[in-house]
Regions:
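An aromatic- and histidine-rich active-site surface loop
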Residues: 92-110
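Conserved acidic residues
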Residues: 58, 89, 142
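Conserved nucleotide-sugar phosphate-binding/catalytic loop shared by glycosyltransferases and other
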Residues: 29-71, 75
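Proline-aspartate-enriched helix->loop->beta-strand connector
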Residues: 83-89
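Structural motif
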Residues: 2, 6, 34, 89-90, 93-94, 117
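Active-site-proximal region of nucleotide-activated glycan assembly enzymes
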Residues: 112-149
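N-terminal subdomain of nucleotide-sugar transferases
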Residues: 1-38
Length: 149
């Protein structure tokens, strides 16, 4: 099994650290990590990967500093290229960022099952970009919706 993990923000790195350590215990599961660059700062990003023993990303997309539409669109283009090349069995997304939404939409369009960590959480404030991302991501997720407490 091949899992394409999409990350872009520091809280996602923290959660992914625990999940990636579990995935690494299984020889028949290969995880490919994609860092979108959404909240990229080399010092902050690198320290999270080192201290959480998270494998270095296989792909760094370098998408940041844009408005929501441009950022999500560029992420979708780049994630789609990676997904078409790697042919994952599952795309795993975390939380409620633009990276989350971009990965979920790509999985949906390419008919790749999506695992969404933190699915179903709501603030009920539709004015928040994160709430829009939560609702849209949950709508396209067909396979797995997980909450990690």
């Amino acid at each position: 099994m091949k899992i394409l993990t999409i990350l872009g923000a520091r809280p996602q790195f923290i959660k992914a650290g625990a999940v990636s350590r579990e995935i690494a215990k299984y020889n028949d599961i290969k995880e490919i990590i994609v860092h979108t660059g959404q909240h990229y700062d080399s010092n902050m990003s690198d320290i999270f990967f080192e201290e959480l023993h998270l494998p270095k990303p296989d792909y760094f997309l370098g998408v940041n500093g844009l408005n929501h539409g441009a950022m999500t669109g560029q992420m979708m283009e780049k994630i789609e290229k990676v997904a078409l090349k790697e042919k994952p069995d599952v795309i795993m997304v975390y939380g409620d960022t633009n990276s989350t939404l971009a990965g979920a939409i790509v999985g949906s369009k390419l008919h790749i099952p999506i695992a969404h960590i933190e699915a179903g959480l709501r603030s009920f404030n539709i004015k928040m970009p994160e709430e829009v991302n939560r609702i849209l991501t949950d709508r396209v997720v067909q396979l797995i919706q997980l909450r990690i407490a």
